[in-house]
A protein has these predicted regions:
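Canonical P-loop GTPase G-domain recognition
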Residues: 5, 13-70
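Walker A/P-loop
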Residues: 68, 73-74, 78
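Short, surface-exposed loop/turn motifs that are enriched in glycine and acidic residues
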Residues: 61-65, 76, 92-97
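Helix-rich effector regions associated with P-loop NTPase G domains
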Residues: 1-5, 11-20, 31, 38, ...
């Protein structure tokens, strides 16, 4: 698969007057790190985390993917000053982005590597994923798969003897990530 890196943008909006980050953002980042994903907290406005993000992108072909208005193009402008790519404010009426980026464009990065800026995604969903394969897409669940009472037939929901549920209850898997898995499974 393609290695994913999570970049939480606009963190300046979640900082208090002492530059301390909101606890819910810290918790979310910690949960994804525990699951094995690199997580970067960045701000295009104040420059926080940009050097670490450049290091993560250096020498790679990367794609910026996310909903409209999350700051993908603003991040790219901050990572490589001088690009001057057009950005818009989030709509005050709808609270959503305005799809300023209308087509994907590949940029060579002066610090090494290249990055594809993409239009905002309107909706994320499941496509042709077998519900029984879904647990394998959650790295933190993989060590427990096959160790349930019902083996690989376990849905990891309410079944007795579920190793995944035991790991959730024991704090080894984030309850929020487990709930996300259950929500996706119900959509599959």
């Amino acid at each position: 698969g393609v290695p994913a890196v999570i970049c939480i943008t606009k963190i300046d909006l979640a900082q208090n007057e002492n530059d301390q980050l909101d606890a819910s953002i810290q918790q979310c980042a910690a949960e994804y790190r525990q699951a094995g994903y690199p997580v970067h907290l960045v701000s295009a406005n104040n420059g926080h985390g940009l050097d670490e993000m450049r290091a993560a992108l250096r020498g790679r072909l990367s794609v910026l993917l996310g909903k409209s208005g999350v700051g993908k193009t603003s991040l790219l402008n901050a990572l490589q000053p001088g690009l001057g790519l057009r950005v818009s404010l989030v709509s005050q009426v709808t609270g959503k982005g305005r799809h300023t980026t209308t087509q994907s464009e590949l940029f060579e990065l002066e610090f090494g590597g290249s990055i594809l800026d993409t239009p905002g995604v309107r909706e994320f969903g499941m496509w042709e994923i077998n519900p029984d394969e879904l647990p394998g897409y959650f790295p933190e669940m993989r060590p427990y798969l096959g160790h349930c009472r019902f083996g690989l037939n376990c849905k990891h929901d309410q079944e007795p003897g579920c190793a995944v549920r035991k790991a959730v209850m024991g704090g080894e898997i984030s309850p929020r990530r487990w709930q996300s898995y259950l929500r996706l499974r119900s959509e599959a």
